[in-house]
Amino acid sequence: RIFPLLSPQIIDRSHPFPHLKNKALYAAAMLTGQDRSLLGIVEVPDSLPPIILLPGENAQYVRTEEVILSQLRKIFKAYHITEQCIVSVTRNADINYAEAGIYDDESEDLRDYMTKALRKRGRLAPVRLEMQGDAPEIRKLLEQKLKLDSQQTYICSCPLILKYAYQLDKADRSLYYTEYTPVYPDYLSKEHPIWPQIQQRDILLFYPYQSMQPFLGLLREAANDPQVLSIQMTIYRLAGNSAVAKHLCTAAENGKSVTVLVELRARFDEENNIEWAKELEEAGCRVVYGIEGYKCHSKICLITRRERGKIQYITQVGTGNYNEKTAKQYTDLCLMTARPELGEDAAVLFR
C-alpha cells in the first residue's frame, strides 16, 4: 500500500536538489557508499493516510512517516545510512504583488492577478526547517541548500505535522470533548420571520454560544422577499460550502441588486474566495474587490427594502467572518438592527 507510491531521490551531480513543498513531510537520510556521502529524500505522499490503525482494542496506531522512515534501509539498500530523520520546510506565504509582476497587465482584473500570484506562492523562499530528531549532517546540508541559518532550524521531538490527530476519531471517539451545539436565542421565534423581530428591537448574537441561524434566516428571507430591493455585503472569509454565498446568489437570480465586496487577499483563503467570486458573478451579483493596497476586514451587510413607499434598512455588523463553520468555534459578536441612522451610515460606506 505504501512502497509503490514512493519516489526516492538521491541528490548528486546528475540529480539536483528537489523543490521541497511547503509543509510537506519528507524522510531524509545521509547515505555513504563508494567513498562519498549523499543525501537521500523520500516524500511522504499526500495520497496516503496520515496514520495506520493497528489491530487490537487499545486504539493503537503508527504514523505513516514513521513507517517510511523505518524502511529507508530497504529503500536505499545499496547504501549505508549514517543518519535519518523526518523533515519539513515552511515557505514564506506573503506575496508581494508588485514584485510578483501581477500588475503588469492593466487589462486584467484583481481576480486574474491573484490567480497568477497564488501559482507563485509554492515557490517562495523557505523561512523555516523543522526536523524530528537531530541529524547534524542532514541539518547542515539542508540549511546550505535552502539558504537558511541555524536560527531558522528547529529540532523537535514531537511529530512535525499534527493534522494526523484529526484521524483519531476513527480510533476512539472517547478522546473527544462532548460536542457543543450553539443555541437559537430563546427571545427569537423560529416560527415567525426574522425581519419584523429585528424591527421591534436590536438583536445581538454571541458566537459560538448562540447560533448563526438567525442571520442566515435573515439572508434567506431577503433573497426571497419581493419587497427587498438590494443586498450589499463585505466578505473576508467564507465556508467551503457557504450558505451565505448561496443566499446571495438566490437573491441575484430573483432580480435583486446584490453587491458584494470580496476580499481576494484573505491569507490562505484566496483560492476559496476566487471561486466564490466567480460563482457570485455568474449568478448576477456585482462583485468588487476593494481598494488596491488595502485589505477589507469589515463585516457589514445592508439590506434595503421598500414597504408602503418607504425605504427600510436592516443592517448587520459583526466582528466575525460570514463563515458558518468558524461561527461554531470562534468568539464573535453579530448585531442586527433596523435603526435608520446605522442603515444610512452603511449606505454611505457602500457608495
Regions found by a protein language model. Give the residues of each.
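N-terminal localization/anchoring segments of enzymes in phospholipid and broader phosphate metabolism
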Residues: 1-351
